[in-house]
Amino acid sequence: MTSRYPSFAAEILDLFAEREAVLTDIAIIQPADPFLDMAGEDLRRRIFLTESETGETLCLRPEFTIPVCLDHIEKRASTPRRYAYLGEVFRQHREGSPEFFQAGVEDLGAKDRPAADARSLADARAILSCVLPNTGFHVTLGDQAVFEAVLSALGLPRGWQKRLARAFGSPAMLEAAIAEFTSPQGTANLPREVASLVAQGNEQRLTHHIEEAMQAAGHSPTAGREPDEIARRLLEKAALRSVRLSDAALNALKSFLAIKVPLEQAGERLTAFADEAGIFLDEALADFSARAERIGDHALPLDEIRYDAGFGRPLDYYTGFIFEIGVEGLRQPLVGGGRYDRLLTLLGAEEPIPGVGFSMWLDRIATVRGEKP
């Protein structure tokens, strides 16, 4: 380890080895498309993009989960398998350094999902306890699968289910989506020509117009959402514009999102919510309860673990269990992680491979230790 690395980096690598996670080497330069397609809007805006001599869009590594999964697929490695990593990632920020260290574990192919979820949380918590002894932590859990089950059980149109699911993890986006669902705004705020093309439902012409407008304004189509994605979403919004969310469904959704309880009480509270709303969530709640039971098996301090029904993480690839670990006095989390069962298939795996993992922000840990990041 060179002096560039945090002072506790070697200790973390030893802790990874103890947990049977094999250290993997991931290139700093990565193909950009997987991140632009799957990493979420917030991360897309922060990616450092470049281009190869052959015209391929490349980027500096903005995170590790996607490239670790790509590497696993390329090597046709067997599963289950646990990968560890420690290195720099690169993201554009208005303040602070654009490069910082992350470390983490990706657990691929474990068939017992509740056990793998619990192990991921327990490993993250145990490693933090080693590098930050005598520190009190708070753990926030969410579940994308439970949220999506609620949307389905409430009978929302499929398009709106997808829209709200994409917004999960961003309170501002979710609030805006719900507001639009309850009182659609039409195309009044769109430029006249765009509004006309949306009204016609001509996706090809709309995509072409958006691409020309982006080029005229000097915006690269690969710097954020691509023109065809923008056109698709505009047309999707137009198709759903006449749909209204009933008062009963809206109240039930708001009631669900307001649930914030200790993990020990979460299963009972979710069951009560389903009964009150008159909806069937048995399968999603069975998975939730199985995971909570496995978390209890690791003897974690349950008084520091809370379930927040509206909590998600702003990355598009999460599908179920989501968590963050933080400390008092620091607004940003020290660790974030969750389950991403669809990601490897979307990246090209020949068969479904379940995955769960976590990332640690080593600069934030250094700050809590009283060291210079």
UniProtKB/Swiss-Prot annotation:
Q: Which UniProt keywords apply?
A: Amino-acid biosynthesis, Cytoplasm, Histidine biosynthesis
Domain of life of the organism in this record? Bacteria
S-S bonds: none
| Recorded GO CC terms | cytoplasm
InterPro entries reported in the protein's UniProt record: aa-tRNA-synth_II/BPL/LPL, HisRS-like_core, HisRS/HisZ, HisZ
Q: Cite the SUPFAM superfamilies for this sequence.
A: Class II aaRS and biotin synthetases
Segments passing through the bilayer: none
| Pfam families linked to this entry | tRNA-synt_His (PF13393)
Keyword Cytoplasm attributed: yes
Q: Where found in the cell?
A: Cytoplasm
* Gene Ontology terms for molecular function: histidine-tRNA ligase activity
Gene Ontology terms: biological process? histidyl-tRNA aminoacylation; L-histidine biosynthetic process
- Pathway participation: Amino-acid biosynthesis; L-histidine biosynthesis; L-histidine from 5-phospho-alpha-D-ribose 1-diphosphate: step 1/9
Q: How does it assemble?
A: Heteromultimer composed of HisG and HisZ subunits.
Q: Which NCBIfam families match?
A: PRK12295.1-4
Question: What HAMAP family does the database record attribute to this sequence?
Answer: HisZ
Q: What does this protein do?
A: Required for the first step of histidine biosynthesis. May allow the feedback regulation of ATP phosphoribosyltransferase activity by histidine.
The misc remark on file is: This function is generally fulfilled by the C-terminal part of HisG, which is missing in some bacteria such as this one.
Name of the protein described by the UniProt record: ATP phosphoribosyltransferase regulatory subunit
Its lineage reads:
Bacteria, Pseudomonadati, Pseudomonadota, Alphaproteobacteria, Hyphomicrobiales
